[in-house]
């Protein structure tokens, strides 16, 4: 089996390597010729042989539609396009319809595992029609860990929806560890915070891979002094909260984690400035001048 991989950045390059290590021939294309196997998308498609051809897109969401448009004249009926990036799930149905008009199947695939996935395997959540999923299943199994981590989540959009919720949960878990770290460091009786995090990794109910990463970071730099407390959000946390609002699903922990990231990017807080002013107005409470 040969597949094409378009987008060989931080994730795509490692995924190509893992597929090759599992004896799945993979032809990669990227705008960076240093990592690309071919010089164009057309050359990539020509190299995929006969039968249902599989093209995996590992691209930023904003590049997916234009890449699909470039692929349409190069694809044949029964080919399969997989979007493995972090696209919003609501975009999947229109993309599937666009390709279906040419007899091409579309699968949306949420992928988790980061830079460690090449070694440990990737968590894979795929959405789309059963027949197309069966065709690509050997590829998905090669990417996934040996003991699981692979699910056909449902129809078109289900893979990206599952990955969106996964990322929302990730936000909340990270925020909980971060708040615990701050309290341990805040004039507490604990004298070795990194050792506490390391001890939590074994036998406790809060052990996780994220906790392992916390422990590794604190082992490198216990006070994290070289790191600015600024946390970006990639968009999926926002989408999770928006979907919860649309469905009237209570989501206090994930919402708070998202808003905490917004707070991290403020040099000063206009909201807190006004609260301080109001406290001064009604109670004569002290104001700390900037």
List PLM regions with ranges.
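NAD(P)+-binding Rossmann beta1-loop-alpha1 motif at the extreme N-terminus of oxidoreductases
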Residues: 1-54, 78, 115-117, 280
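Hydrophobic beta-strand scaffold residues
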Residues: 26, 106-107, 251
């Amino acid at each position: 089996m040969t597949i094409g991989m378009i987008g060989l950045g931080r994730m795509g390059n490692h995924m190509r390597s893992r597929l090759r290590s599992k004896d799945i021939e993979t032809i990669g294309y990227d705008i960076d010729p240093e990592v690309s196997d071919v010089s164009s998308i057309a050359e990539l498609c020509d190299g995929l042989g006969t039968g249902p051809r599989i093209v995996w897109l590992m691209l930023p969401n904003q590049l997916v539609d234009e890449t699909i448009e470039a692929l349409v004249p190069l694809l044949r009926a029964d080919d399969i396009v997989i979007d493995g990036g972090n696209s919003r799930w609501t975009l999947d149905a229109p993309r599937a319809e666009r390709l279906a008009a040419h007899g091409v199947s579309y699968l949306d695939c949420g992928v988790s595992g980061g830079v460690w996935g090449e070694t440990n395997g990737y968590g894979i959540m795929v959405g789309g029609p059963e027949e197309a999923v069966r065709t690509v299943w050997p590829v998905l199994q090669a990417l996934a860990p040996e003991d699981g981590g692979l699910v056909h989540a449902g129809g078109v959009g289900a893979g990206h929806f599952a990955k969106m919720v996964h990322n929302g949960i990730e936000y909340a878990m990270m925020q909980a560890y971060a708040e615990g770290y701050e309290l341990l460091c805040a004039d507490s009786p604990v004298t070795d915070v990194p050792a506490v995090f390391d001890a939590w990794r074994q036998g406790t109910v809060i052990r996780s891979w994220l906790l392992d990463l916390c422990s590794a970071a604190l082992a490198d730099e216990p006070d994290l002094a070289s790191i600015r407390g600024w946390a970006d959000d990639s968009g999926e946390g926002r989408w999770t909260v928006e979907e919860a609002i649309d469905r009237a699903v209570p989501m206090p922990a994930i919402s708070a984690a998202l808003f905490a990231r917004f707070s991290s990017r403020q040099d000063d807080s206009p909201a807190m400035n006004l609260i301080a002013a109001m406290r001064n107005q009604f109670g004569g409470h002290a104001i700390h001048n900037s």
